[in-house]
């Protein structure tokens, strides 16, 4: 009966499944297993291909490394990144804040690029939002961490924001998907993904032991559905409908920025990167001084690593006709997940031991 109910719900909500559906977390240093602040974004977007690139410092701006959509040759819209000063920023779209204006929309990437150029701290980011021309053209939960203890979300619409500091809540961390707690009650999206994330990490949240590995290797590869109460990656079904899991057909990256606790250590920031559809990707550590070439765009504007992962993703969603693209081939994906998790955990261990 439960399987039948789940199937009917999935069919009824197919259109909703196409909404951009990022899942994220801001973790203060005291809630982190490494004692360093964390910024996580599991990204969902209609732009299937993306890359990571460096922007050098200028006379009036900091240098930074960020995630971009393929085709963004001007590096105009940063979708997550960190700068030379130990500041990092990301966003999730929010669907229950004030309506967009008719004039300016989808400016979140521009705002984040500007923040990476100008901001050292969460307070700097607040000041930036205060001074930007209004309307800002954003409807977002911006997450930031810095090298001075800042870790916060800014639930932001065209004309203002509400700030939530992770260090001021009992757990020391905050989760956001595609609704804002300051917005319209029970509106927006991502309530099940929000619950998925919290349940998958319940023990570690309670213990204050969240790590980058837990976010990329457990949550971003999990097909746990909190409403149904099971993880479909652990089952035997071949075909599973893609709805309300953290990883989705629209997922294009999962990134954890592991920050630092002092500006003197800004060079030690690590951006743990699953580029492309996360269940099919292998982790790549990025530092300010070392951006692996496979993540950067080549002559065609695409990252070789992202293209490799997108090819694997196509095998996980092999049906093209009708509603076929909504079905995951779990027989293909289960061994891929297991192998990529094993390889990624080895990379985490090697980097933490040897710095590479």
Protein language model regions, located:
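Positively charged n-region of N-terminal signal peptides that target proteins for export
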Residues: 1-5
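Bacterial N-terminal signal peptides
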Residues: 8-15
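Boundary at the C-terminal end of the N-terminal hydrophobic targeting segment
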Residues: 17-21
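C-terminal, well-structured catalytic/ligand-binding subdomain of enzymes
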Residues: 23-75, 80-81, 91-117, 140, ...
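A short, structured loop/turn motif at beta-sheet edges
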Residues: 84-85, 116-122
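A residue-level signal for conserved active-site and pocket-lining positions in enzyme catalytic cores
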Residues: 86, 125, 255
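Secretory/export targeting leaders with adjacent low-complexity proregions
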Residues: 127-143
């Amino acid at each position: 009966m439960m399987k039948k109910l789940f199937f009917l719900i999935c069919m009824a909500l197919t259109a909703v499944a196409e909404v951009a559906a990022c899942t994220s977390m801001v973790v203060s240093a005291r809630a982190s297993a490494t004692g360093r602040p964390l910024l996580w974004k599991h990204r969902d977007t209609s732009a299937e291909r993306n890359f990571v690139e460096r922007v050098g410092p200028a006379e009036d701006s900091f240098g930074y490394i960020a995630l971009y959509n393929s085709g963004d040759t001007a590096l105009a819209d940063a979708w997550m990144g960190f700068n030379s000063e130990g500041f990092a920023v990301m966003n999730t779209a929010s669907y229950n804040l004030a309506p967009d204006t008719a004039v300016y929309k989808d400016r979140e990437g521009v705002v984040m690029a500007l923040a990476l150029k100008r901001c050292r701290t969460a307070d700097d980011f607040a000041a930036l939002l205060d001074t930007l021309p209004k309307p800002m053209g954003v409807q977002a939960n911006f997450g930031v961490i810095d090298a001075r203890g800042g870790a916060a979300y800014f639930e932001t619409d065209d004309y203002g924001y509400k700030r939530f500091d992770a260090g001021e809540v009992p757990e020391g961390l905050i989760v956001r998907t595609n609704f804002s707690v300051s917005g319209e009650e029970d509106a927006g999206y991502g309530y099940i993904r929000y619950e998925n994330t919290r349940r998958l990490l319940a023990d570690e949240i309670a213990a204050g032991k969240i790590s980058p590995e837990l976010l990329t290797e457990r949550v971003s590869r999990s097909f746990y559905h909190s409403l149904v109460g099971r993880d479909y990656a652990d089952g035997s079904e071949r075909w599973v409908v893609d709805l309300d899991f953290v990883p989705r057909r629209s997922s294009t990256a999962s990134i954890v920025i592991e920050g630092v606790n002092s500006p003197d250590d800004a060079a030690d920031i690590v951006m743990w990167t699953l580029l492309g559809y996360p269940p099919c990707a292998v982790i790549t550590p990025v530092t300010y001084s070392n951006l692996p070439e496979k993540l950067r765009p080549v002559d065609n504007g695409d990252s070789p690593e992202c293209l490799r992962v997108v090819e694997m993703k196509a095998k996980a969603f092999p049906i093209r006709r009708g509603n076929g693209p909504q079905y995951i081939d779990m027989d293909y994906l289960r061994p891929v997940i297991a192998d990529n998790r094993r390889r990624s955990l080895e990379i985490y261990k090697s980097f933490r031991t040897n710095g590479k």
